């Protein structure tokens, strides 16, 4: 039940407290101990992790230490089994990221399927540390067993290739949120940094939102235009998320969420 899940989880795109971390200089020891205690007991979910892309493109194995490893675009890796364990995190949303280039050239759905496959293969390879989760009950059980939940979220709504049937199939495969765009406007939703052509969400885009509500899939408004954010809020009957965005009042960028939307 995704409504229960929305209450249960704490989305934490960046979470610095870890079991193995030493107390920062100048920190209050009592407050630090209390923070660690809360963290250990809480269910903490990271809303967006791009590690499936190098798992697929670079054959990266999660058992390999990530220090000194880099994505093809030069960004450093932050994820491996030992870091997951040290962090005390309950779960990670593995990003099924589909480049906007594939919206233009074709192959978006296949790319999503490839990343879903590589994610499942990783959890099957390391069953002692990882477990695939799709429900709140799964997450609670993983926490109890000391395993990390692997969840999945699609980044780029064009991965469904304008098919509600494909959306339903992705849900059946375990996808539990979808970011409606990435950095390109597509057939039914406008991106934050691209030329709009739908005045927000198209009629079909609103159908997508309603079907995601029916399925129990989170609607993710990271990367979308502010008009899309407001359209989603008008249409959705369920809670929405911004899986990896900040507050625009604190960092004035179109990727971030304005006070008006908040």
Regions found by a protein language model. Give the residues of each.
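Sec-dependent N-terminal signal peptides
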Residues: 5-14
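Histidine/acidic residue-rich metal-binding segments in metalloenzymes
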Residues: 36, 162-172, 194-241, 254-262
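Histidine-centered catalytic micro-motifs
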Residues: 44-51, 224, 242-245
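Acidic, glycine-rich active-site loops and adjacent beta-strand->loop/helix elements
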Residues: 98, 246-247
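Short, catalytically relevant binding-site loops at active-site mouths
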Residues: 226-227, 247-249
